[in-house]
Every structure is written in structure tokens, then in C-alpha cells.
Curated annotation (Swiss-Prot):
InterPro entries: NTP_hydrolase-rel, P-loop_NTPase. Belongs to the UPF0200 family. Keywords: ATP-binding, Nucleotide-binding. It comes from Thermococcus onnurineus (strain NA1). It holds the Pfam family AAA_17. This is UPF0200 protein TON_1344. GO terms for molecular function: ATP binding.
Length: 185
């Protein structure tokens, strides 16, 4: 089984991924795939370079470029595990790539929704090199994500979790969701 976790930047995807990992489920991060490709191209890991490589990959390999690069990582993990989580799928083309590459696997999409103002504050506090420091940067990044088609993936989710609450409550919601998914599938 493949569990795709999607949501806008700063929505809380990593909490879900970490909860699966605590239960022994390995993961592949689509963002890490892009960052690895950025480094392979000899570029410094800045938000500008990562964004450019993300766009360039899609120009070179199609809208499902990052998924194509991630398929082998997922395949390797599925050889040893019954369940693999993919973090950060951004388009239905990418979902389709995984469906085509793994026709015998059940694929479940989990989406996280968090209000924009909460995501902005979390991203500023997170401090990763590609996180926005101004509202304008934040909005620009959101528009890029939406242009990739992330909204369509969110709309097709099998499970939706809302992260509009204190951290402890969200963690409880995540634990319940992960337990439910693993029990039902």
C-alpha cells in the first residue's frame, strides 16, 4: 500500500509522515527528491534554486517529473515493506505516475488543510532555507504550488485532516487518522 500525503507548505504533512514512521512505515519525500536534484546540478540549496529546479524538472521530464524520480526509491522500499508513505505529491500527474508504476498497490491520498495565516507563521518559525519570510513570499509560493496542481490532489483525497487547532490536538487527530488508515487497509 502507498499512502500519499499532500497539503500546502506548512500544513502539517510531516507530522503525519512522522506518525507513520513511528509505526515502522518508511517514507519518501518529494521535496527531498527536488533538493537532491538541485544539489546534483551543483546549485546551492536556496529557495530560489530549489523552485527553479522544480520548475525545470517539470519542463524537462513533464508534470510528473518529481514522481518519476521518486519511483525507484518507492519501489526499493516496497520490496521490504508492505506500506510506504510518499510525502508532498503536488499534482494528479504525479499520482498517476505512482498508480502506473505500482498497479497492484492500493494507493491512498491523505490531505492536510491548514488556514493560510497559520501556515505562514509556522513556516516562518520553521526556518528551513526555502521557507518564506514575508507574506508576499508566502503567497507567491502558494500560487506556485497551486499551479503545479496541488489543489486537485487535495480535492481527490481519500482522507482529509484539518490542522486548525493547538499542536496537541492536531497530534491526537493525526494519531487517530493513522490508526484508522492502518486498521482499515
Amino acid at each position: 500500500m502507498i499512502i500519499i500525503v499532500t497539503g500546502m507548505p506548512g500544513s502539517g504533512k510531516s507530522k503525519i509522515v512522522k506518525e507513520f514512521e513511528k509505526r515502522g512505515v518508511p517514507s519518501v519525500s518529494m521535496g527531498d527528491v527536488v533538493r537532491e536534484e538541485t544539489a546534483k546540478r551543483g546549485l546551492e540549496l536556496t529557495k530560489e534554486n530549489v523552485a527553479k529546479v522544480s520548475i525545470r524538472l517539470r519542463q524537462e521530464l513533464g508534470q510528473n517529473a518529481v514522481a518519476k524520480l521518486a519511483v525507484e526509491k518507492v519501489r526499493e522500499l516496497l520490496r521490504k515493506n508492505k506500506v510506504v508513505v510518499i510525502d508532498g505529491v503536488r499534482s494528479l500527474d504525479e499520482v498517476g505516475t505512482f498508480r502506473s508504476a505500482f498497479p497492484g498497490e492500493e494507493i491512498i491520498i491523505v490531505a492536510v488543510h491548514t488556514p493560510p495565516h497559520m501556515r505562514f507563521e509556522r513556516l516562518k518559525a520553521r526556518g528551513r532555507h526555502d521557507d518564506p519570510q514575508s507574506w508576499e513570499d508566502f503567497e507567491e509560493r502558494d500560487w506556485k504550488e497551486l499551479k503545479f496542481g496541488i489543489g486537485n490532489v487535495i480535492a481527490m483525497a481519500d482522507y482529509m485532516i484539518v490542522n486548525d487547532c493547538p499542536k496537541e490536538e492536531y497530534e491526537r487527530r493525526v494519531q487517530e487518522l493513522v490508526e484508522k488508515i492502518l486498521a482499515e487497509h
